[in-house]
Swiss-Prot record:
<feature type="binding site">
    <location>
        <position position="226"/>
    </location>
    <ligand>
        <name>NADP(+)</name>
    </ligand>
</feature>
<dbReference type="GO" id="GO:0000166">
    <property type="term" value="F:nucleotide binding"/>
</dbReference>
<dbReference type="InterPro" id="IPR036291">
    <property type="entry name" value="NAD(P)-bd_dom_sf"/>
</dbReference>
<keyword id="KW-0560">Oxidoreductase</keyword>
<dbReference type="InterPro" id="IPR050700">
    <property type="entry name" value="YIM1/Zinc_Alcohol_DH_Fams"/>
</dbReference>
<keyword id="KW-0547">Nucleotide-binding</keyword>
<keyword id="KW-0521">NADP</keyword>
<feature type="domain" description="Enoyl reductase (ER)">
    <location>
        <begin position="21"/>
        <end position="362"/>
    </location>
</feature>
<feature type="binding site">
    <location>
        <begin position="185"/>
        <end position="188"/>
    </location>
    <ligand>
        <name>NADP(+)</name>
    </ligand>
</feature>
<comment type="pathway">
    <text>Mycotoxin biosynthesis.</text>
</comment>
<dbReference type="InterPro" id="IPR020843">
    <property type="entry name" value="PKS_ER"/>
</dbReference>
<keyword id="KW-0843">Virulence</keyword>
<dbReference type="GO" id="GO:0016491">
    <property type="term" value="F:oxidoreductase activity"/>
</dbReference>
<dbReference type="Pfam" id="PF13602">
    <property type="entry name" value="ADH_zinc_N_2"/>
</dbReference>
<dbReference type="InterPro" id="IPR011032">
    <property type="entry name" value="GroES-like_sf"/>
</dbReference>
<protein>
    <recommendedName>
        <fullName>Medium chain reductase pydE</fullName>
        <ecNumber>1.-.-.-</ecNumber>
    </recommendedName>
</protein>
<dbReference type="GO" id="GO:0005739">
    <property type="term" value="C:mitochondrion"/>
</dbReference>
Amino acid sequence: MSSTMRGWVRQHRGPYESSLKLIDSLPVPPDPGSDSSDIIVRVSYVALEFSIAHIMGIFPALPFAPPLVPEICVSGTVASAGGKAPEELRQPGTQVLAMTDPMSMMLFGTGALKEYMRLPEQYVVPLLQPSHSVTTDHPHGTAERPQALTLAEGAGLISNGSAAQAVVRAANVLSGQRVLVNGASGSVGHIVSQLCRARGAYVVGVASGVNQDFVRRYGCNEFVDYTKHTDLPEYLASTYGSQPFDSILDCVGSQDLYANSPRYLLPGRPLVNIGAFSMTDSLLSTLYQWSMNSWCPTWLGGVPRPYILFSNTPDMQGVLSLVEMVQQGKLKVHIDSEFEMEDLIKAYERVTSKRARGKVLIRIH
């Protein structure tokens, strides 16, 4: 293995188009010793996050911090492992899902857009969970085998699957409830819809008309084409006001949807925002609006429905449960597009367009 590797580095504050540079002189992390439980992951795919693309244009580089390598979630294979690493992660070539701690990315620059990562064992899990299988037809009778989860799909499952799982729990979605998913064709939204259906909820998905078949295929009972309605809240009120939703899961970040929610959301039931926002909004205006939604009492003009702003760090143990759902045939992960490492800027353009159906990935190896 070479002593250096390629990676994308943020050189200064500014839009990703001007602040990122691909270099080939990053040091390859040293092999863990016999007393370490760390894993060296040879990165195959990196999943891109909308929030990280936005943050690069806002936050300055921290004093004395090394150049920042962005992104946190990857899939790949074990290159080497420390002597105290879990047995299932020691074999070189083992396919894994992994992530770096977001604070480590911000403070120490240890992000994912590079060829190799050294990670603590708690941030790495094997891709295949062999204890779970699904029954399939076989020429010689019935056979059981795990539903395949590819490295690409696995990379797309880590952050978005964790976010979807946490949002559904935060809304306490239960069997028989009616749920509105805004942005049902997105990287998080299409997983949210499936998890709600898995709990027995009736799901209405909002997306553009070209995504109708996609949205229905990934869990929605009904579809609303927002492009056909100049005033979406008015349409929702007239169509669903007599049968309000038990919760609204907003994967887009629509203030109008929340401001008008008493017209189509049951009293005491929440709108949960996954932390979505517009690239055109300033950080201060976004934070101000989120704060007003969360804390402003109704007697001061606040909306009389709970507002939950949800943002979470991916939970690798939670990811394991999602991997099991995929292997059992209960969950599907859609990849919007894959880009070569050299085409990161084009990939971020796709992410920030908010037109991606599913996850956008960078292919490293």
